[in-house]
């Protein structure tokens, strides 16, 4: 295969922009639900779901995050790259076994 015999590239034809307001007006249909008032719907959450919805329940240890941020800023954060690599390799090996 010769490099000199390649076909010349043709210019791409430009795409004409559409008017988004015209498209939105054409596709928008009046909804019957928007005209009628919505009847009351009652939702009952389980205790576990209610606990998760409370603002005090966090799955992030904020104190640990702040400690790590300060260690990074001060340059005192040490990482065991060998341990990270071993865990990564173990994870990949487990994934390959399960595939």
UniProtKB/Swiss-Prot annotation:
GO terms for biological process: bacterial-type flagellum organization; negative regulation of DNA-templated transcription. The keyword Transcription regulation applies. Transmembrane segments: none annotated. The keyword Repressor applies. InterPro entries: Anti-sigma-28_factor_FlgM_sf, FlgM, FlgM_C. It holds the Pfam family FlgM. Coiled coil: none annotated. Residues 22-39 have a biased composition (Polar residues). Residues 1-42 are annotated as: Disordered. Keywords: Bacterial flagellum biogenesis, Repressor, Transcription, Transcription regulation. Belongs to the FlgM family. Responsible for the coupling of flagellin expression to flagellar assembly by preventing expression of the flagellin genes when a component of the middle class of proteins is defective. It negatively regulates flagellar genes by inhibiting the activity of FliA by directly binding to FliA. This is Negative regulator of flagellin synthesis. The gene is flgM.
């Amino acid at each position: 295969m010769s490099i000199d015999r390649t076909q010349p590239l043709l210019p791409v034809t430009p795409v004409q922009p559409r008017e988004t307001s015209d498209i939105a007006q054409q596709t928008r249909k009046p909804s019957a639900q928007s005209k009628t008032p919505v009847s009351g719907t009652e939702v009952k959450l389980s205790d576990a779901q209610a606990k998760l919805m409370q603002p005090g329940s966090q799955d992030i240890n904020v104190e640990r995050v702040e400690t790590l941020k300060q260690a990074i800023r001060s340059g005192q954060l040490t990482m065991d790259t060998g341990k990270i690599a071993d865990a990564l390799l173990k994870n990949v090996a487990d994934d390959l076994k399960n595939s």
